[in-house]
Regions:
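A short glycine-centered flexible hinge/capping loop motif at secondary-structure junctions
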Residues: 223-227, 430-434, 471-475
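Transmembrane beta-barrel architecture of outer-membrane proteins
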Residues: 31, 76-78, 142-144, 190, ...
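Small/polar, glycine/serine/threonine/aspartate-rich low-complexity segments that form flexible
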Residues: 55-71, 120-148, 271-287, 316, ...
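Periplasmic alpha-helical coiled-coil/stalk elements that build and connect Gram-negative outer-membrane
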Residues: 159, 175-290, 401, 405, ...
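Membrane-embedded beta-strand positions in outer-membrane beta-barrel channels/transporters
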Residues: 80, 144-148, 192, 237, ...
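Sec/SRP-type N-terminal targeting helices
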Residues: 91-92, 108-109, 153-181, 231, ...
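Terminal intrinsically disordered/low-complexity segments used for targeting and assembly
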Residues: 2-7, 14-20, 26-85, 143, ...
Length: 486
């Protein structure tokens, strides 16, 4: 076997393309546009309302996982699990995240060569002169098979910046999904807790109605016996009917919460029924961290920060438009007019070579696009900082709210204890004939009002606890919550 003479006489046929390819690879390590640096935010050392709160530690159960389990209610846990799997708003956000994840795969694929295969047969005809004596029909067959490879050399980093932007956008979409899940979980837990307090309110009013019915019967008997006047009967009737009306109103309120829970779980209200229970979930002890931890715990803050990263990378994409695009192409195959010798050495062909494309004039469109993307970046930075401030505000508000409700609960309980004692003394005086029934009615009304006030403030404390947990990010964490699954 002899060497090809062209190879012996001119070895540069191999060296020059290799050198060119090496230069392209080295240049492709560069990327125009700014590298990302997380914007700074002013973070206080601790929350203003943190005095008296238990500080969170790494061992606290609140730091990770299903935060709603701190209420110790198995029924609630099952409802939230159903929400996580069946809520339609969550499904929308999950689909948006899958779209963003697909864009990441598409952008990553643009970094690699594209391989194409084409094969086909064509038949063509060319008109011939009527005087032709060749006997040819003028019909020709052509067989073609071609394999092509093309690769865009990412010399200026346009494709890599695009991948960086799409990855950050996917992470932001994942954080948006977590934020929506947290919001809906919080809504369901609040509805459930309010419903359970209403169940207790309903039991209170039902027992009160029974007591008032007995009082009305007794008052009527006393009126018929001439012991009391007609006004006592009228007052007892008023007291009973007012309480019955309040009980009916609670039934409507409970139905609203029950229907809301059904829809949150992706069910029609007619398909869901939540039986009453005899207990109210206990108020949890909520540990609080330091403000800097909030930046890692809240998914909405993480989403805002990832949006900055995406905008920053898009600046590089926009600036890369000022530079030429380089594409390396290689193709080869077989072309013949006869099927029998189609795939044969004489019928092969090939081509190889680079291409360059550069926009020379665009009347300022590229410059305007860079200015637009830089303005988008500034906008996302401002949005991020505002989101952080809003997060601090929410935590401070709910911490103060819980403290105030705790103090109010103490005073409300003291008022209830006093009202119960007053009712006991008044009832004894009425039985002894010292006072009339109207005095008893007034004290009973006050006692019932205080009973309901204690339950109302308990409901407010439970709701505020949910809001505080959600404001601190629930069980979400940026270190694991921004991992994109392929």
């Amino acid at each position: 076997m002899t060497d090809h003479p062209a190879i012996k006489s001119n070895p540069q046929w191999l060296v020059r393309p290799l050198a060119t390819g090496l230069c392209v690879l080295l240049l492709s390590a560069c990327a125009v546009g700014p590298d990302y640096h997380k914007p700074s935010v002013t973070t206080p050392v601790q929350f203003k309302a943190a005095e008296g709160w238990r500080q969170a530690t790494p061992s606290d159960a609140m730091a990770r996982g299903a935060w709603w389990e701190v209420y110790g209610d198995s029924e609630l846990n099952a409802l939230v699990a159903r929400l996580n799997s069946s809520n339609q708003t969550v499904a929308q956000y999950e689909a948006q995240y899958r779209q963003a994840r697909a864009l990441v795969r598409s952008s990553r694929g643009a970094l690699f060569p594209t391989l194409d295969l084409t094969a086909g047969k064509t038949r063509s005809s060319q008109g011939s002169s009527s005087t032709s004596t060749s006997g040819s029909s003028g019909i020709n067959d052509s067989y073609n098979a071609q394999l092509g490879v093309s690769w865009e050399a990412d010399i200026w980093g346009k494709l890599r910046r695009g991948l960086e932007a799409d990855t950050a956008s996917a992470q932001a979409s994942l954080a948006d999904l977590a934020a929506m899940q947290l919001s809906l979980q919080s809504e369901l837990v609040q509805n459930y807790l309010q419903l359970r307090v209403l169940d207790e309110q309903k039991r209170l009013l039902e027992s009160t109605v029974q007591a008032y019915e007995r009082s009305l019967t007794m008052t009527r008997n006393q009126y018929q016996a001439g012991i009391s006047g007609r006004e006592a009967v009228a007052q007892a009737q008023t007291q009973l009917k007012t309480t019955q009306a309040d009980l009916i109103d609670l039934t409507w309120q409970r139905a609203q919460f029950e229907n809301a829970i059904a829809v949150l779980m992706g069910m029609a209200p007619a398909e869901f029924n939540l039986p009453a229970t005899t207990t109210i979930p206990e108020l949890p002890q909520i540990p609080v961290g330091i403000p800097s931890q909030l930046l890692e715990r809240r998914p909405d803050i993480a989403a805002a920060e990832r949006s900055i990263m995406a905008a920053n990378a898009n600046i590089g994409v926009a600036k890369a438009a000022y530079y030429p695009d380089f594409t390396l192409s290689l193709s080869g195959g077989y072309n013949s007019n006869s099927f029998s010798n189609w795939i044969s050495l004489p019928n092969r062909f090939w081509s190889v070579g680079p291409q360059m494309a550069l926009t020379l004039f665009d009347a300022g469109r590229r410059s305007a696009e860079v200015d637009r993307i830089e303005a988008v970046y500034d906008q996302t930075v401002a949005q991020y900082r505002q989101t952080v401030l809003n997060g601090f505000q929410e935590v401070e508000n709910y911490m103060v709210q819980l403290k105030v409700y705790e103090e109010e609960a103490t005073v409300r309980q003291e008022a209830l204890d006093a009202a119960r004692e007053s009712l006991r003394l008044t009832s004894n005086q009425y039985k002894a004939g010292v006072i009339g029934y109207l005095d008893v009615v007034n004290v009973q009304t006050t006692a019932l009002s205080n009973e309901r006030s204690v339950l109302n403030v308990l409901q407010s404390r439970l709701i505020a606890s949910v809001q505080l947990i959600a404001a601190m990010g629930g069980g979400w964490d940026a270190r694991s919550g921004l991992q994109i699954k392929e």
